[in-house]
Structure formats: C-alpha cells, structure tokens
C-alpha cells in the first residue's frame, strides 16, 4: 500500500471516528443530541422582526367589547439583542395589517376588523435618555414664602393675618447693678447703728 493511500485512509477514519462514537443519553437512547452552532445562536438573537404574541386589550385601549376572540394575536415586532448596552432595538420600517376579530357583547356578537402595527425593519440605535432639566437659580424669581395657615383661623375682612401680628418685646429684668430696693434701703448699715448707739448713751448720761 502506497504512503499516499495510507494517509487518505487515515484521514477518512479520523473524520468518521467522532460520528461513530457512542453518545450516552438515558432519556433518548439511540438519538444523538443536537447542538445549535454559535453562528445560529447569534443570528437568532440579533435585532430583527420576530413573531410575538400581543394581547388585544393592550392594543385596543377603551374598546367597549366585552370579549374579544381571540384575546391575543401574533404580529411581527422588533426584538433581539444589540452589541452594546447603550443601544436598543427599534423599528425603522413599519406597516399596518388588518385582522378580523370576533367581538362579543352580550347578547349579540359581530365580526369586525382591527388594524395592528407590524415592523418590517429593525436597527440598533442609541437609547433615548431622559434629560433632567434643572431650573437655573439665577433666572428663577425668588418668591417670599407665604405664612403658614393657622388651624381654625377665620380672619375677618381687613383683619391682619396671624403672620402679620407683631407681639411687643418684654422689658428686660433688673440687672445686678440696679438700685437697691426699698427694703434694702430701710436696713441700717454699720455706721448708722454706731451713731444711734452713741446718741443713746449721751441721752442716758444727761439723764
């Protein structure tokens, strides 16, 4: 056998070896487990129109129908993953599709038509950020705060409000250096007591 033929036979055996290897599957013996390739997983998850189930009560806000048959329909809407967290899958092409829906309202029912939106093209675009507009303090006029209302206050016409009523400031109390009171003025001091004693002794000596 020539070396070239040996190499070809070895290559064929290497290719057939993984396919002939036994696969252990307790739940399904004799069946090889199917693995979805990465390219298929990525293609299925990309941003594209896909069939989704939409409840009719969310599409028809304010409908008087008591019951809709069917209660939900399938339409093509954009969905899927974007390569960046700052992007979102949004529709770039849409059209209207009309469907027949049975509207039941006791005791009668009728077959009607309704228009639903379907997406035909999708694209990943930056997410819309809600800009928080803060008012400029310099441009905002300053308003004087209004006085708080007093419970039970019923002002008469022309009467001042409780916030406009001013109370007199109480006079300051006596200080430490204030003049002595009347009681302390009547109390004799040491010099006065000595003069009174001398006067009484003179009176006694003269007697």
Swiss-Prot record:
Modification after translation (UniProt) = VEGF-B186 is O-glycosylated.
Q: Which GO terms describe its biological process?
A: induction of positive chemotaxis; positive regulation of cell division; positive regulation of mast cell chemotaxis; response to hypoxia; sprouting angiogenesis; vascular endothelial growth factor receptor signaling pathway; vascular endothelial growth factor signaling pathway
Compositionally biased tracts (Low complexity): 174-201
One annotated GO molecular function: growth factor activity
Which residue positions does the secretion signal occupy? 1-21
Q: List the disulfide bonds.
A: 47-89, 78-122, 82-124
Q: Which UniProt keywords apply?
A: Disulfide bond, Glycoprotein, Growth factor, Heparin-binding, Mitogen, Secreted, Signal
Pfam families recorded: PDGF
Q: Compositional bias (Basic and acidic residues) at which positions?
A: 124-139
**Where does it localize?**
Secreted
Spell out the residue ranges making up region: Disordered: 124-207
Membrane spanning residue stretches: none
What GO cellular component is one of the record's annotations? membrane
Q: What this chain does, per the record?
A: Growth factor for endothelial cells. VEGF-B167 binds heparin and neuropilin-1 whereas the binding to neuropilin-1 of VEGF-B186 is regulated by proteolysis.
Subunit composition and interactions? Homodimer; disulfide-linked. Can also form heterodimer with VEGF.
Question: Belongs to which family?
Answer: Belongs to the PDGF/VEGF growth factor family.
Q: Report what the protein is called.
A: Vascular endothelial growth factor B
């Amino acid at each position: 056998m020539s070396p070239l033929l040996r190499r070809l036979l070895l290559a064929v055996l290497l290719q057939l070896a993984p396919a002939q290897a036994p696969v252990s599957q307790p739940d399904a013996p004799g069946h090889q487990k199917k693995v979805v390739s990465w390219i298929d997983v990525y293609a299925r998850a990309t941003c594209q129109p896909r069939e989704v189930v939409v409840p009719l009560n969310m599409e028809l806000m304010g409908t008087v129908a008591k019951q809709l048959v069917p209660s939900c329909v399938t339409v093509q809407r954009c969905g899927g993953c974007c390569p960046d967290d700052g992007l979102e899958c949004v529709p770039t092409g849409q059209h209207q599709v009309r469907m027949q829906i049975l509207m039941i309202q006791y005791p009668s029912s009728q077959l009607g038509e309704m228009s639903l939106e379907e997406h035909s093209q999708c694209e990943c675009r930056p997410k819309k950020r809600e800009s928080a507009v803060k008012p400029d303090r310099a441009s905002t006029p300053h308003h004087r705060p209004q006085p708080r209302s007093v419970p039970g206050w019923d002002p008469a016409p022309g009467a001042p409000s409780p916030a406009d009523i001013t109370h007199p400031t109480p006079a300051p109390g006596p200080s430490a250096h204030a003049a002595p009171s009347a009681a302390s003025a009547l109390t004799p001091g040491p010099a006065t007591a000595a003069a009174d004693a001398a006067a009484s002794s003179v009176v006694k000596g003269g007697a």
